[in-house]
Amino acid sequence: MAYTPIHFTEDDRIFQAQVQRFAEREVAPIADAIDHEDRFPEEVIAKFGDMGLIQWSVPEVYGGPEGSLTKLCIAREELARYSLSLSVMAGENGNGMALPLLFAGTEAQKTKYFPMLAEGKTLVAFALSEPEAGSDAASLRTRAVRDGDDWLISGNKIFVTCGPVADYVLVFARTNDAPRAKGVSAFIVDTSLPGVTRGPKNRKMGYNGATPNCDFFFDNVRVPADAMVGGDGEGFAIAMKCMEFNRPAMSASAVGIAQGALDRAVAFAKDREQFGKPIAEFQGLQFMMADMAMQIESARALLYEVTARYDAGQMDGYGALSAMVKTLCSDAAMKVTTDAVQILGGYGYMQEFSVERMMRDAKVTQIFEGTNQIQRMLVARDLLA
């Protein structure tokens, strides 16, 4: 069983139960199918918007839910027990627009975009990575050149989550000759503008369905000056703040995948008989399942400690903690899902059983929001400062 963190409020627990029911009713029945078909489930995404999950970070004053990081992670975890891709759609518009506007937007930008986001029907993507700028994101080559009152954006972005279905995309581009991160700015770009081209949908190992990926190409895309979020050269700092917020959210998705895999492994071990008894009675498998549970609970404990600190405004050391929790949770997800496949044996390798999908999905949690090697570097840098 999964243990609910002791510091959850009554409101947190009620919300958790609501999302659990929603996930069992709406997500579980389609989770395998949207992976196999790589189909974007518009009908369920619309219900996410109705629940306020997509527009999670939009302030209440603009019609949004203004949800806490803790509740976002609760939603992510419960949804990921069945589907990682649908889990990530909770708070999907955060990185792409809501969080950048909260961190650095003008009042005019907030008034323009937040009411639209609050309806839960607009999808926004986050375009940072480039062919030559992955972990070294500050080396990006996409450029924005001033042309009167406008900017002209040219360049190429890769691995843009929700790119094929996005109405807007937050584009990070070099706007001046300052070295590396100091020369990067952020722009809100309407994907229907002339000069914006999407590449074909990427074919991925996992993480299929609700989170399609594609590349973007920008050819002298003209945007007004007020499309820039923050000041000239402040874009990289905005990107890093978004990623620090989202690392616990991705961690929650990882914990959810792991819990879902453990639940399936335990149920299978109780039911599957070999040598005249359920395989759950063999000590070797009992030890495996015990280790899986311990990894999940330790990851969950750190996760909600980190979210509680963020929600309380206790930001001292938060950057290192967000790196720690992302690494711990995603490594646990990879190990637990792999062990779940092993417990199911040949059945675990079959697509009719969900654990092989969960193992494929778990891998991306070690890569997104910064690879786990980068996270370890950030933790070490904090220790040695």
Question: Language-model segments: what does each one mean?
Answer:
Residues 139, 194-222:
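Flexible, small-/acidic-enriched active-site or ligand-binding loops
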